[in-house]
Protein backbone atom coordinates (compact mmCIF):
# COMPACT_ATOMS: atom_id res chain seq x y z
CA UNK A 1 0.00 0.00 0.00
CA UNK A 2 1.11 3.53 -0.68
CA UNK A 3 1.67 6.23 1.93
CA UNK A 4 -1.24 8.24 0.58
CA UNK A 5 -3.63 5.31 0.96
CA UNK A 6 -2.42 4.66 4.49
CA UNK A 7 -3.04 8.32 5.35
CA UNK A 8 -6.50 8.26 3.74
CA UNK A 9 -7.34 5.07 5.60
CA UNK A 10 -6.15 6.65 8.85
CA UNK A 11 -8.32 9.71 8.15
CA UNK A 12 -11.31 7.40 7.59
CA UNK A 13 -10.70 5.77 10.97
CA UNK A 14 -10.25 9.17 12.65
CA UNK A 15 -13.47 10.45 11.06
CA UNK A 16 -15.26 7.38 12.36
CA UNK A 17 -13.86 7.96 15.86
CA UNK A 18 -14.81 11.64 15.78
CA UNK A 19 -18.35 11.13 14.53
CA UNK A 20 -19.11 8.05 16.61
CA UNK A 21 -20.50 6.35 13.51
CA UNK A 22 -19.35 3.16 11.86
CA UNK A 23 -16.55 3.45 9.33
CA UNK A 24 -17.59 3.69 5.66
CA UNK A 25 -16.49 0.22 4.59
CA UNK A 26 -17.07 0.91 0.88
CA UNK A 27 -14.55 3.77 0.90
CA UNK A 28 -12.05 1.60 2.75
CA UNK A 29 -12.50 -1.23 0.23
CA UNK A 30 -11.83 1.20 -2.63
CA UNK A 31 -8.66 2.38 -0.89
CA UNK A 32 -7.23 -1.11 -0.42
CA UNK A 33 -8.67 -3.02 -3.40
CA UNK A 34 -5.37 -2.89 -5.35
CA UNK A 35 -3.43 -4.38 -2.44
CA UNK A 36 -5.28 -7.69 -2.78
CA UNK A 37 -6.57 -7.76 0.81
CA UNK A 38 -9.42 -10.06 1.75
CA UNK A 39 -12.23 -8.88 4.03
CA UNK A 40 -10.50 -10.26 7.14
CA UNK A 41 -7.29 -8.37 6.33
CA UNK A 42 -9.22 -5.12 5.79
CA UNK A 43 -11.00 -5.49 9.12
CA UNK A 44 -7.71 -6.25 10.87
CA UNK A 45 -6.10 -3.18 9.27
CA UNK A 46 -8.98 -0.95 10.40
CA UNK A 47 -8.86 -2.42 13.92
CA UNK A 48 -5.09 -1.90 14.15
CA UNK A 49 -5.26 1.73 13.02
CA UNK A 50 -8.24 2.33 15.33
CA UNK A 51 -6.27 0.87 18.26
CA UNK A 52 -3.20 2.97 17.44
CA UNK A 53 -5.10 6.26 17.08
CA UNK A 54 -7.43 5.67 20.04
CA UNK A 55 -4.62 4.83 22.46
CA UNK A 56 -2.35 7.57 21.14
CA UNK A 57 -5.01 10.18 21.85
CA UNK A 58 -5.92 8.58 25.16
CA UNK A 59 -2.29 8.57 26.35
CA UNK A 60 -1.45 12.00 24.85
CA UNK A 61 1.35 10.72 22.63
CA UNK A 62 3.12 13.26 20.43
CA UNK A 63 3.62 12.79 16.70
CA UNK A 64 7.34 11.94 16.81
CA UNK A 65 6.91 9.36 19.58
CA UNK A 66 4.07 7.72 17.67
CA UNK A 67 6.18 7.51 14.52
CA UNK A 68 9.16 6.08 16.42
CA UNK A 69 7.04 3.49 18.22
CA UNK A 70 5.41 2.35 14.97
CA UNK A 71 8.84 2.02 13.33
CA UNK A 72 10.03 -0.08 16.26
CA UNK A 73 7.06 -2.38 15.61
CA UNK A 74 8.34 -2.91 12.06
CA UNK A 75 6.19 -0.56 9.97
CA UNK A 76 7.96 1.20 7.09
CA UNK A 77 9.02 4.77 7.96
CA UNK A 78 6.84 6.26 5.21
CA UNK A 79 3.73 4.54 6.57
CA UNK A 80 4.59 5.64 10.11
CA UNK A 81 4.96 9.23 8.95
CA UNK A 82 1.62 9.09 7.11
CA UNK A 83 -0.20 7.80 10.19
CA UNK A 84 1.58 10.32 12.41
CA UNK A 85 0.71 13.27 10.16
CA UNK A 86 -2.96 12.32 10.05
CA UNK A 87 -2.87 11.86 13.82
CA UNK A 88 -1.27 15.27 14.38
CA UNK A 89 -3.84 17.03 12.18
CA UNK A 90 -6.79 15.59 14.13
CA UNK A 91 -5.34 15.08 17.61
CA UNK A 92 -6.89 18.13 19.32
CA UNK A 93 -10.31 17.49 17.81
CA UNK A 94 -10.21 13.87 19.01
CA UNK A 95 -8.98 14.92 22.47
CA UNK A 96 -11.90 17.31 22.90
CA UNK A 97 -14.37 14.64 21.74
CA UNK A 98 -12.86 12.07 24.11
CA UNK A 99 -12.94 14.61 26.94
CA UNK A 100 -16.62 15.30 26.35
CA UNK A 101 -17.41 11.57 26.28
CA UNK A 102 -15.59 10.61 29.46
CA UNK A 103 -17.42 9.33 32.49
CA UNK A 104 -19.28 12.13 34.17
CA UNK A 105 -20.90 11.51 37.50
CA UNK A 106 -24.40 12.77 38.21
CA UNK A 107 -24.57 16.12 39.97
CA UNK A 108 -27.01 17.69 42.36
CA UNK A 109 -29.33 19.89 40.34
CA UNK A 110 -31.43 21.19 43.21
CA UNK A 111 -32.49 20.38 46.74
CA UNK A 112 -35.92 21.02 48.19
CA UNK A 113 -36.63 20.56 51.86
CA UNK A 114 -39.22 21.23 54.49
CA UNK A 115 -39.75 20.42 58.14
CA UNK A 116 -43.01 18.76 59.12
CA UNK A 117 -44.40 18.12 62.54
CA UNK A 118 -45.47 14.48 62.43
CA UNK A 119 -48.49 13.30 64.37
CA UNK A 120 -48.17 9.70 63.11
CA UNK A 121 -45.96 7.91 60.58
CA UNK A 122 -45.00 4.45 59.35
CA UNK A 123 -41.29 5.31 59.16
CA UNK A 124 -40.73 7.26 62.38
CA UNK A 125 -41.36 5.70 65.79
CA UNK A 126 -41.61 8.98 67.69
CA UNK A 127 -44.82 10.81 67.03
CA UNK A 128 -45.24 14.51 67.77
CA UNK A 129 -41.67 15.14 66.61
CA UNK A 130 -40.30 17.15 63.71
CA UNK A 131 -39.43 15.32 60.48
CA UNK A 132 -37.36 16.58 57.56
CA UNK A 133 -38.65 15.98 54.03
CA UNK A 134 -35.80 16.11 51.47
CA UNK A 135 -36.08 15.96 47.69
CA UNK A 136 -32.82 15.75 45.75
CA UNK A 137 -33.01 16.48 42.04
CA UNK A 138 -30.03 14.80 40.38
CA UNK A 139 -28.87 15.56 36.84
CA UNK A 140 -27.38 12.73 34.78
CA UNK A 141 -24.87 14.31 32.36
CA UNK A 142 -24.92 11.46 29.85
CA UNK A 143 -28.56 12.04 28.90
CA UNK A 144 -29.34 15.36 30.67
CA UNK A 145 -32.17 13.65 32.55
CA UNK A 146 -33.16 14.98 35.98
CA UNK A 147 -34.48 12.46 38.50
CA UNK A 148 -36.16 13.08 41.86
CA UNK A 149 -35.00 11.30 45.02
CA UNK A 150 -37.40 12.15 47.86
CA UNK A 151 -37.02 10.81 51.39
CA UNK A 152 -37.99 11.54 54.97
CA UNK A 153 -35.74 11.45 58.05
CA UNK A 154 -36.11 12.40 61.67
CA UNK A 155 -34.73 15.69 62.94
CA UNK A 156 -32.06 13.82 64.96
CA UNK A 157 -30.85 11.88 61.91
CA UNK A 158 -30.89 15.07 59.86
CA UNK A 159 -28.62 16.79 62.40
CA UNK A 160 -26.19 13.85 62.25
CA UNK A 161 -26.27 13.92 58.43
CA UNK A 162 -25.75 17.68 58.38
CA UNK A 163 -22.69 17.64 60.67
CA UNK A 164 -21.14 14.65 58.89
CA UNK A 165 -21.55 16.38 55.52
CA UNK A 166 -20.00 19.55 56.95
CA UNK A 167 -17.04 17.48 58.17
CA UNK A 168 -16.68 15.78 54.78
CA UNK A 169 -16.76 19.15 53.03
CA UNK A 170 -14.05 20.50 55.35
CA UNK A 171 -11.86 17.45 54.65
CA UNK A 172 -12.33 17.87 50.89
CA UNK A 173 -11.38 21.55 51.10
CA UNK A 174 -8.19 20.75 53.04
CA UNK A 175 -7.24 18.09 50.47
CA UNK A 176 -7.80 20.51 47.57
CA UNK A 177 -5.53 23.18 49.10
From Swiss-Prot:
Supply the name of the protein.
COMM domain-containing protein 4
Q: What is the lineage of its organism?
A: Eukaryota, Amoebozoa, Evosea, Eumycetozoa, Dictyostelia
Source species of the chain: Dictyostelium discoideum (Social amoeba)
Describe the family membership recorded for this protein in Swiss-Prot or TrEMBL. Belongs to the COMM domain-containing protein 4 family.
Protein function: Scaffold protein in the commander complex that is essential for endosomal recycling of transmembrane cargos; the commander complex is composed of the CCC subcomplex and the retriever subcomplex.
GO BP terms in the entry: signal transduction
CDD domains attached to this UniProt entry: Commd4 (cd04752)
Q: How does it assemble?
A: Component of the commander complex consisting of the CCC subcomplex and the retriever subcomplex. Component of the CCC subcomplex.
Pfam families reported in the protein's UniProt record: COMM_domain, COMM_HN
Domain COMM: start-end pairs: 107-176
PANTHER family listed in its UniProt record: COMM DOMAIN-CONTAINING PROTEIN 4, COMM DOMAIN-CONTAINING PROTEIN 4-8 FAMILY MEMBER
Q: Which cysteines are joined by disulfide bonds?
A: none
Amino acid sequence: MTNIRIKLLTVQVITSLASGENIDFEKVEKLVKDAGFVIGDIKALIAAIHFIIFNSVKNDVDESTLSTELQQLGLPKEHCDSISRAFREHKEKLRSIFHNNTLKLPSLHSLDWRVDFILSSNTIQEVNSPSVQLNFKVKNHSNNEITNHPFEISAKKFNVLYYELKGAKLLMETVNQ
